[in-house]
C-alpha cells in the first residue's frame, strides 16, 4: 500500500483589519439608518391616506345605517378615535388629537349641520366641509 500524502497549499488569508471592519460597519449602519427614515416617512403617509379613506367609508356607512333603519345616528369624533356606535376608527400616530365633535344623521341619512371636520397631520391640514341635508362632503387638503 502506498501512502500518498498530498501537500496542502497554504493560501494566504487576508483579513480586514479592525479599522477597516469598523469603517465598513459605520458605512453600512449609516446607509441603513438613512433608508429606514425614508421608509418610515412613506409608511406614515400611507397610514394617513388609509385613515382618511376609512373615515370617508365610516361616514358613508353611518349615513346608510341611518337611512336603512330610519333611525337617527351620530358619528362621534373625540380625542384619537371616531365611532358611530358600531364601528370605531383609531387615529394614526401622526395625526394630532381632535376636539370633541358630533355629527348627527337624521332618519333620511342627511346631516343637519354645515360643520367642518379638520384633521392636522405633521405636514398638511385636511378639511372635510359637510353639506347640510344630503350628507355629502367636500375634502380639501392644504400644506402646512
Task: Describe each PLM feature range.
Residues 1-39:
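N-terminal single-pass transmembrane signal-anchor helix
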Residues 13, 46-53:
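Residues at secondary-structure transition points
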Amino acid at each position: 500500500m502506498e501512502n500518498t500524502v498530498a501537500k496542502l497549499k497554504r493560501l494566504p488569508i487576508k483579513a480586514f483589519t479592525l479599522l477597516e471592519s469598523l469603517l465598513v460597519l459605520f458605512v453600512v449602519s449609516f446607509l441603513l439608518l438613512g433608508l429606514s427614515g425614508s421608509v418610515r416617512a412613506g409608511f406614515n403617509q400611507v397610514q394617513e391616506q388609509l385613515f382618511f379613506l376609512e373615515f370617508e367609508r365610516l361616514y358613508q356607512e353611518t349615513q346608510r345605517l341611518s337611512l336603512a333603519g330610519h333611525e337617527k345616528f351620530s358619528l362621534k369624533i373625540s380625542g384619537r378615535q371616531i365611532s358611530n356606535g358600531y364601528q370605531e376608527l383609531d387615529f394614526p400616530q401622526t395625526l394630532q388629537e381632535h376636539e370633541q365633535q358630533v355629527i348627527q344623521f337624521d332618519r333620511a341619512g342627511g346631516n343637519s349641520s354645515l360643520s367642518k371636520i379638520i384633521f392636522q397631520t405633521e405636514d398638511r391640514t385636511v378639511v372635510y366641509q359637510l353639506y347640510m341635508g344630503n350628507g355629502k362632503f367636500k375634502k380639501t387638503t392644504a400644506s402646512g
